[in-house]
Amino acid sequence: MMRFISLAGCALAGIFSACLVQPLAAQTAEQLTFIPAGGRTLLSNIVASKPSADELKPLLTGKHSREEWSAYLKSRSQALPAVQRLNDKEQATLADYLSYHMPLPQVPANMARTDWTRTLPKDGRDLSLDNCQGCHIITVVVTQERTKKAWLGTLSTPSHAVIKMTPAERDELASYLVLNAGIPIEQVPEELRASGATY
């Protein structure tokens, strides 16, 4: 009976999380900097570095696997200093994001005047902050080191199945967490530590 109540409460929290999480995220943006940037942010930063159109357009119009994107980014790092500055994990995160979202359905005509933080699709970090705080704080998620299969298993449990995410979003979220979760608790601000909470 208690388990049913717990699941029901979690389900209700999931339903209302879309309304509650965004203000929370806005209020704690500085505190959440310990969570690694997702592909949307990394790609936005590359665009902000003002690469030539010849270098930028292939990033927005190509269709490749994560491995192919990773090789492409390495091959273009000399021409794209913003890519060269990324560490291995960030490059892998960006390649993963590109594999999910490129090519864009439509490339803006005026790329220089486009607000890319709004134009680009959400990344795994965005999805975690938008959807993973209905029943617990985000720290419960990002401090765990798990396989993709394990993450997808959790996302399919009754308490998580009610969260409004597409299968593709769930897959992308799991992939982001494989690359970026497992953050040591010492790197988490004390006010956001989960006191040992887990799934």
Predicted regions and their residues:
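Bacterial N-terminal signal peptides
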Residues: 9-19
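Positively charged n-region of N-terminal signal peptides that target proteins for export
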Residues: 1-5
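Sec/Tat signal peptide C-region and signal peptidase I cleavage site
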Residues: 20-26
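The canonical Cys-X-X-Cys-His
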Residues: 47-54, 94, 128-139, 173
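C-terminal capping alpha-helices of c-type cytochrome domains
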Residues: 84-107, 163-199
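Short microdomains enriched in Cys/His and/or Lys/Arg
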Residues: 72-76, 152-166
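Electrostatic cytochrome c docking/interface patches
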Residues: 27-47, 55-61, 78-84, 90, ...
